[in-house]
C-alpha cells in the first residue's frame, strides 16, 4: 500500500505498527498526500462517506518487484474495488491479484462499493466483475449483490453471482438481517443478533 509522507500517513503507519501489523511494504510517498475518508453517522448509527482523494497516495500506487515476492509469501491476499477506482492503482490491484491466484495464495475480494469514487456506475460494475475471477472468497453486501446482478431476490442474486465465477465461497452480509453464505453445494443463512447500533463503520 501507499500513504503520504504527512502527519496522516505517519499516524496510520504508527497505529498499524502498534497493532503488530507488518508495514514493511507500506510506502510513504513524498509526492502524494494521504487519502482522507470522513465518516458521517446518522441517528441509527448507519454511515456514509466523503473522501478527500484527488491524486491520493493510494491511487498512485505502482507495482515494484518486491510486491510480487511479498504476495507469494502471504497466506491470504485481500483486495477491494476502492483501489480500482483510478489508475495506476487499478492496474496494480489486477496485477497483484492475478499473481496471487497464479501462485495459489488464497484471494479474498470485497467490492466495498463507494460509487462516489467512480466516474460512473457502468465503470464500477465492469471493473468489479473483471476482478471476480481472481477471487477464491467474495464478500458482498446486499446492495452490492443487486448492483452486480440486477437481481432483487437475495438467494437468486447470490446463486447467479456464485455460478458465474470460479469462487469457492460467497458471503452476503445483510446488516441487521444477518448473513447468507454459499460454498460448494451448501447454502447457509444466519440471522443477525439484536444489538444497539453505535457505528456500522
Each language-model region and where it sits:
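Proline-centered loop/turn at the N-terminus of a beta-strand
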Residues: 106, 137, 168-169
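Structural recognition of alpha->loop->beta junctions
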Residues: 17-21, 122-147
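Hydrophobic beta-strand scaffold residues
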Residues: 23, 107-109
Amino acid at each position: 500500500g501507499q500513504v503520504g509522507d504527512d502527519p496522516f500517513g505517519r499516524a496510520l503507519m504508527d497505529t498499524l505498527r502498534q497493532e503488530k501489523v507488518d508495514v514493511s511494504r507500506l510506502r510513504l510517498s513524498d509526492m502524494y498526500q494521504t487519502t482522507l475518508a470522513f465518516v458521517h453517522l446518522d441517528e441509527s448509527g448507519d454511515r456514509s462517506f466523503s473522501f478527500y482523494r484527488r491524486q491520493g497516495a493510494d491511487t498512485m500506487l505502482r507495482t515494484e518487484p518486491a510486491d510480487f515476492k511479498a504476495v507469494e509469501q502471504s497466506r491470504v491476499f485481500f483486495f477491494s474495488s476502492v483501489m480500482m477506482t483510478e489508475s495506476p492503482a487499478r492496474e496494480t490491484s489486477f496485477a497483484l491479484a492475478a499473481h496471487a491466484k497464479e501462485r495459489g495464495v488464497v484471494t479474498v475480494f470485497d467490492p466495498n462499493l463507494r460509487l462516489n469514487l467512480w466516474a460512473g456506475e457502468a465503470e464500477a460494475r465492469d471493473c468489479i466483475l473483471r476482478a471476480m475471477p481472481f477471487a477464491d472468497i467474495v464478500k458482498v453486501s446486499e446492495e452490492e449483490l443487486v448492483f452486480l446482478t440486477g437481481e432483487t431476490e437475495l438467494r437468486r442474486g447470490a446463486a447467479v453471482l456464485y455460478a458465474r465465477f470460479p469462487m469457492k465461497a460467497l458471503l452476503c452480509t445483510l446488516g441487521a438481517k444477518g448473513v447468507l453464505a454459499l460454498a460448494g453445494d451448501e447454502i447457509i443463512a444466519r440471522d443477525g443478533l439484536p444489538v444497539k447500533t453505535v457505528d456500522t463503520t
